[in-house]
């Protein structure tokens, strides 16, 4: 497989929308929504921190330096953007809590502010978040493009959007996935085990994005062409499908087609199950009750069946499925933005957008779907 980045298909068919977005503390805000309420009792202090111009790991280093706490003692649910104004929760042993207020000015000098202090009985771990609320400000937006953006947002609100991994996953030079494959091939290895695991996960992410784009291509072809033309397309791809199934797929109202053998999952949390009745599952998908999932290949990954598996095979890798420390999983192909709000400020030619996404989903995927930049690649911003 070609490991260079290829343009990823969009869900919707509008023309490119021209505007400027700068990922900065003024124009991009991220607010973490915790997975559970904190009990206000326990051996761990939980603080809500606002930061700007800092990565999460840089923030943890500052806390370690100022408070004398070991980084291993600090807990956090996820990594937040450096070029944004972000709030997130971190935990630390209760004994360090009295030092927080004493060092307020020291934190402020580092672009950190503690917004709240609570307590809980366990340390915050990776994944202990429900999702994130986002705010984005688009500039140099004409009234016509603002109207087009609203129309796209209506489609996203109704049908959702592709759940692509964002460019952060692939590094500054878009080569994390290539390094991950080299690790699997025993061509390179780093001393830090977490770095090795992250780079391998970047390769998984690359394959997932490519599979999702391929599925979008197939969905668009099913919608755009006749049953006869589709049969010829599937024949050329050595994929078996009968005319009645194609007719049923064309009748699915959602732009992303549920295929025979897809692994579905109750949305946004729940068990995996096979898509047996395509019409029924497509209706549930349209109602946002369940959604199809894509492969993150690994030793214990759950694979699709039938037609879905035939397509998925191209994006499997035996080095992933045999790698002892890469267990694998599945990820929603599709995600639904919630609480979408928008406002066009005509006198400033600015468009303000707010929305919520569940954990693991990227604001960059929504921006990509709106903008439809020509010649677009994963490193668009």
Curated annotation (Swiss-Prot):
Annotated active site: 81
E.C. number(s) listed in UniProt: 5.4.99.27
InterPro entries, sorted: PsdUridine_synth_cat_dom_sf, PsdUridine_synth_TruD, PsdUridine_synth_TruD_CS, PsdUridine_synth_TruD_insert, TruD_catalytic, TruD_pseudoU_synthase
Domain TRUD: 160-335
KW Secreted (keyword) present: no
GO biological-process terms attached to the record: tRNA pseudouridine synthesis
A Gene Ontology molecular function term of the record: RNA binding
Catalytic activity: uridine(13) in tRNA = pseudouridine(13) in tRNA
Disulfide bonds: none
Class of the enzyme per the UniProt entry, highest EC level: isomerase
Keywords of this entry: Isomerase, tRNA processing
Annotated Gene Ontology cellular component terms: cytosol
Protein family according to the UniProt entry: Belongs to the pseudouridine synthase TruD family.
Task of the protein: Responsible for synthesis of pseudouridine from uracil-13 in transfer RNAs.
Protein name: tRNA pseudouridine synthase D
Organism: Helicobacter pylori (strain Shi470)
Species classification: Bacteria, Pseudomonadati, Campylobacterota, Epsilonproteobacteria, Campylobacterales
């Amino acid at each position: 497989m070609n490991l260079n980045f290829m343009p990823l298909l969009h869900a919707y068919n509008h023309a490119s929308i021209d505007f400027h977005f700068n990922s900065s503390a003024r124009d991009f805000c991220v607010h973490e929504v915790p997975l559970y309420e904190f009990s206000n009792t326990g051996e761990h202090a939980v603080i809500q921190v606002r930061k700007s111009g800092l990565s999460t790991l840089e923030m943890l280093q500052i806390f370690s330096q100022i408070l004398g706490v070991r980084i291993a003692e600090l807990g956090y649910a996820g990594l937040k953007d450096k070029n944004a104004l972000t709030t997130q929760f971190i935990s630390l042993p209760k004994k360090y809590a009295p030092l927080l207020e004493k060092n307020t000015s020291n934190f402020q000098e580092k672009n950190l502010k503690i917004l709240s202090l609570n307590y809980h009985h366990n340390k915050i771990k990776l994944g202990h978040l429900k999702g994130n609320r986002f705010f984005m400000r688009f500039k140099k937006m004409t009234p016509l493009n603002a109207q087009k953006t609203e129309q796209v947002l209506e489609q996203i609100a109704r049908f959702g959007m592709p759940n692509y991994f964002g460019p952060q996953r692939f590094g500054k030079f878009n080569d994390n996935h290539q390094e991950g494959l080299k690790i699997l091939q025993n061509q390179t290895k780093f001393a830090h085990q977490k770095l090795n695991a992250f780079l391998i996960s970047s390769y998984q992410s690359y394959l997932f994005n490519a599979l999702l784009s391929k599925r979008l291509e197939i969905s668009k072809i099913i919608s755009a062409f006749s049953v006869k033309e589709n049969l010829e397309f599937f024949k050329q791809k050595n994929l078996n499908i009968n005319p009645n199934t194609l007719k049923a797929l064309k009748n699915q109202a959602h732009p992303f087609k549920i295929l025979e053998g897809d692994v579905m999952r109750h949305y946004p949390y729940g068990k995996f199950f096979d898509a047996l009745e395509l019409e029924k599952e497509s209706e549930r998908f349209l109602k946002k009750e369940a959604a199809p999932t894509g492969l993150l290949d690994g030793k214990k990954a759950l694979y699709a069946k039938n037609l879905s598996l035939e397509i998925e095979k191209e994006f499997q890798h035996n080095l992933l499925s045999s790698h002892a420390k890469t267990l694998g999983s599945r990820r929603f192909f599709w995600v639904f933005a919630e609480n979408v709000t928008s406002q066009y400020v005509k006198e400033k030619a600015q468009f303000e957008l707010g929305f919520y996404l569940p954990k693991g989903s990227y604001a960059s995927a929504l921006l990509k779907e709106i903008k439809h930049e020509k010649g677009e690649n994963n490193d668009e911003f």
